[in-house]
Design a protein with these regions (language model features):
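Sec-dependent N-terminal signal peptides
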Residues: 3-13
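A beta-strand edge to alpha-helix "cap/lid" segment located at domain peripheries
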Residues: 16-43, 50-135
Length: 135
């Protein structure tokens, strides 16, 4: 009996920390945005996404994916700092500073608040709000 429990205990010890999974989802979203990868964005964004840009423009999932993959503006990189994740069961709030670099434009810094939800084991961004801040 003691040996039967050992594999279960070992698998629990190596279970991924949900906060790390949220950070991985945030990283997956930024990588998909930089690559203009519609399938990647589909994976990391919740169907009922509400995305509010620093300038006040809001978009749903369909609008955001179209703008990122077909729009004239292209993301070059996102660099997060002071990133914090707070878990609320199957929801999480991520806050951070983010330096955003766009192709052919001056980079800028935002303070971002993102809400993630767990859908069938996959963490997805459900809401995003950012505000421009100085460096």
């Amino acid at each position: 009996m003691r040996w039967a429990i050992l594999p279960i205990a070992a698998s629990l010890a190596f279970a991924a920390d949900p906060a790390d999974l949220v950070r991985e989802a945030a990283s997956g979203w930024t990588q998909a945005a930089v690559k203009q990868d519609a399938a990647g964005l589909e994976r990391f964004l919740a169907d009922d996404l509400q995305y509010a840009h620093a300038g006040g423009q809001t978009q749903n999932k369909r609008e955001y994916i179209a703008a990122v993959t077909k729009g004239p503006a292209r993301y070059e990189s996102f660099t997060f700092s002071d990133q914090k994740v707070v878990l609320y069961g199957k929801a999480a709030v991520l806050t951070a500073f983010c330096d955003v670099k766009m192709v052919g434009r001056e980079s800028f810094r935002v303070r971002t608040l993102q809400v993630y939800v767990e859908n069938n084991g996959q963490w997805q961004m459900a809401a995003h709000q950012s505000t421009r801040v100085g460096r």
